[in-house]
């Protein structure tokens, strides 16, 4: 099996159908597979019968994004894993061969970070009008809506962490890949259309759910991976207190909920502690950050 396309989904059946219909047009089921995990959503289960070529995993109780990915990725058989959000699909012509070519010509390549083209477009041709151009570069992270990782590299790591929820699992996998000595490449030449309503997101403003989970997972990230996490944690907590907790009562309340929860869960999180090499942290500092659309 050449490529496994992997999608975790919840509460977005209509978006998932669009993604699966797009994928079906570009895959060859003799060498490609599509695996979808439904993370505790009865409404999405209703479309399973319409896609018998998909390898479905159905969880009756939600476990959140990162643990769900950890479950799903263990089932993939392809030499290359392509991770997609349920509302994202490839735009690049000859996408599959292009992904394979990148890995075949660079043995040290662990992850390819695709260019994210955000927005709702009438056609893929319209979406391609918004593609940016530039030189590929080695980076520190990848965007979860569209990326590729070699199966052998993924299996050499601990995979997506079960001790995280959502928002933050990509940096955890990325730092483990870097610590193994592999590269993460951002390329403008492989694009995915992330079909989000950018205007609506801007109008929605504050995102309390994201704030809570990002802060929680960032604390855990430093506790697990950094050799000396105290300074990083102080900076993280001060930044979030100053920039969020002091500006809004709901942020303030969530901030302290996360802090006290982190203290209570400290013994269980430290069981996963796996500090990376100092050379990995230095590499992170010197590399160019990923480009977010």
Predicted regions and their residues:
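Acidic donor-binding segment of Leloir-type glycosyltransferases
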Residues: 20-59
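Catalytic core of nucleotide-sugar-dependent glycosyltransferases
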Residues: 192, 202-232, 253-268
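Non-catalytic, C-terminal membrane-associated alpha-helical segments of glycosyltransferases
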Residues: 228-293
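Short aromatic/hydrophobic "clamp" motif used to bind/position activated sugar donors
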Residues: 81
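Glycine-rich, basic loop-to-helix element that forms the pyrophosphate-binding segment
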Residues: 60-76
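Conserved donor NDP-sugar-binding/catalytic core segment of glycosyltransferases
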Residues: 89-124
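A recurrent flexible, glycine/aromatic-enriched loop bordering the glycosyltransferase active site
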Residues: 118-119, 132-149, 165-166, 171, ...
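A short, conserved alpha-helix in the catalytic core of glycosyltransferases
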Residues: 149, 153-158, 163-191, 198
């Amino acid at each position: 099996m050449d490529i496994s396309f992997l999608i975790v989904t919840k509460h977005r059946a209509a978006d998932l159908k669009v993604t699966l219909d797009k994928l079906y047009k570009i895959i060859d089921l003799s060498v490609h597979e599509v695996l979808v995990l439904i993370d505790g959503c009865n409404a999405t289960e209703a479309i399973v019968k319409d896609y018998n070529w998909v390898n479905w995993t159905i969880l009756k109780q939600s476990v959140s994004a990162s643990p769900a990915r950890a479950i799903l990725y263990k089932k993939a058989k392809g030499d290359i894993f392509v991770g997609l959000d349920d509302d994202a699909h490839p735009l690049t012509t000859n996408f599959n061969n292009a992904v394979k070519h990148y890995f075949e010509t660079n043995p040290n390549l662990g992850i390819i970070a695709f260019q994210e083209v955000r927005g709702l477009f009438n056609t893929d041709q319209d979406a391609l009008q918004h593609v940016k151009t530039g030189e590929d570069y080695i980076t520190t992270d990848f965007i979860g809506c569209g990326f590729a990782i070699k199966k052998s590299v993924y299996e050499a790591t601990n995979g997506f962490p079960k001790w995280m929820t959502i928002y933050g699992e990509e940096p955890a996998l990325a730092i483990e890949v870097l610590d193994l000595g592999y590269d993460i490449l951002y390329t403008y030449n492989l694009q995915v259309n992330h079909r989000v309503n950018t205007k609506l997101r801007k109008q929605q403003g504050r995102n309390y759910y994201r704030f809570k989970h990002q802060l929680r997972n960032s604390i855990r990230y430093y506790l697990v991976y950094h050799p000396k996490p105290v300074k990083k944690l102080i900076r993280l907590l001060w930044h979030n207190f100053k920039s969020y907790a002091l500006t809004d009562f709901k942020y303030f309340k969530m901030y302290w909920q996360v802090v006290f929860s982190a203290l209570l869960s400290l013994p269980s999180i430290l069981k996963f502690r796996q500090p990376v090499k100092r050379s990995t942290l230095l590499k992170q500092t010197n590399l160019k950050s990923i480009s977010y659309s």
